[in-house]
């Protein structure tokens, strides 16, 4: 058993603007005092299959950690929407919270995130709809996803638990564990029902009345936004995409709660005072968060 056990994690709001900051409240039980503390990093992951374009939203160190129950918060910045291409903006993505002890990853918390726009079904804005890939390409993507899953499984051989959802009831072991990739695929396969329920209803109406109705609704929804943008210098926030007028400040995201949680076995060894290396006076201190 590790030194730290996650009891619960909460996000301040599961539905918000993509440009709004986030706050996570975490509760742990610490079985042995951790003097050197642990580090947490919050990442906005644009592609569940790659971390190449991840954005770091927060990076903190919590130290020291006393034995017993502890609780702390992580304040994370909003992702920079200007660094996200529009054809990769909408649909399913993820926010990750990674915990490390002396560089060793011991916990990985993944929130599946659905990014959409008010009044427009996400499927109308997603990259797959724009490119209309052939069946052969779709089959190839499914094979690639399976290959990625197998690779992740082999790399994470030391994983203690492939998926543990928020530990609210320790006796409830009926649900089958899922990997983060499986959770994303489940949401995608059921969605195409998107997490925005209102969007799903509008998508059904679209099949009856045609896409022109969406354009009309979208123009009405964004009329004041568009007029305001034309009369100001903030035109960069309003763009035309897939036949719709998109205001980047109005883009929404919804976090699926509870998150998918992966635990990893690591070596929890505290250095003795004689083995500790003194900090160089010229080194800038790491950002720490006090635990009360």
Swiss-Prot record:
Location of region: Disordered: 123-239, 267-292
GO terms (BP aspect): DNA replication-dependent chromatin assembly; nucleosome assembly; nucleosome disassembly
Cysteine pairs bridged by disulfides in the record: none
UniProt superkingdom: Eukaryota
Localization terms from the record: Nucleus
One Pfam family in the UniProt entry: ASF1_hist_chap
GO molecular function: histone binding
Compositionally biased intervals (Basic and acidic residues): 189-199, 217-226
InterPro entries xref list: ASF1-like, ASF1-like_sf, Hist_deposition_Asf1
A GO cellular-component term linked to this record: chromatin
Keyword rRNA-binding: no
SUPFAM superfamilies: ASF1-like
Major location (coarse): nucleus
UniProt entry keywords in alphabetical sequence: Chaperone, Chromatin regulator, Nucleus, Transcription, Transcription regulation
Bias-annotated ranges (Acidic residues): 131-159, 227-239
Assembly notes: Interacts with histone H3 and histone H4.
Annotated family: Belongs to the ASF1 family.
Protein's job: Histone chaperone that facilitates histone deposition and histone exchange and removal during nucleosome assembly and disassembly.
Protein name: Histone chaperone ASF1
């Amino acid at each position: 058993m590790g030194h730290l056990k996650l009891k619960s994690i909460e996000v301040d709001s599961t539905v918000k603007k993509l440009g709004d900051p986030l706050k996570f409240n975490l509760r742990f039980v610490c079985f042995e005092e951790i003097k050197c503390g642990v580090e947490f990093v919050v990442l906005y992951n644009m592609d569940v299959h790659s971390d190449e374009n991840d954005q770091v939203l927060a990076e903190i160190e919590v130290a020291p950690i006393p034995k017993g129950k502890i609780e702390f918060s992580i304040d994370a910045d909003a992702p920079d929407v200007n660094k996200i291409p529009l054809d990769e903006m909408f649909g399913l993505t993820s926010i990750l919270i990674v915990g490390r002890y002396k560089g060793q990853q011991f916990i990985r918390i993944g929130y599946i995130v659905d990014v959409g726009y008010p009044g427009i079904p996400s499927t109308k804005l997603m990259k797959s709809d724009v490119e209309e890939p052939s069946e052969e390409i779709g089959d190839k993507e499914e094979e690639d996803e399976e290959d990625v899953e197998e690779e992740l499984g082999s790399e994470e051989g030391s994983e203690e638990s492939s998926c543990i959802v928020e530990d609210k009831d320790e006796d409830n072991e009926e649900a089958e564990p899922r990997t983060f990739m499986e959770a994303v695929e489940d949401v995608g396969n059921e969605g195409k029902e998107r997490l925005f329920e209102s969007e799903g209803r509008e998508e059904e109406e679209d099949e009856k009345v045609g896409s022109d109705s969406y354009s009309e609704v979208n123009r009405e929804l964004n009329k004041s936004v568009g007029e305001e943008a034309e009369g100001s210098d903030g035109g960069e926030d309003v763009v035309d995409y897939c036949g719709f007028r998109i205001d980047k400040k109005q883009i929404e995201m919804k976090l699926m709660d509870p998150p998918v949680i992966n635990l990893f076995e690591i070596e929890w060894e505290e250095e003795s005072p004689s083995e500790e290396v003194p900090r160089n006076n010229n080194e800038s201190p790491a950002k720490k968060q006090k635990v009360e």
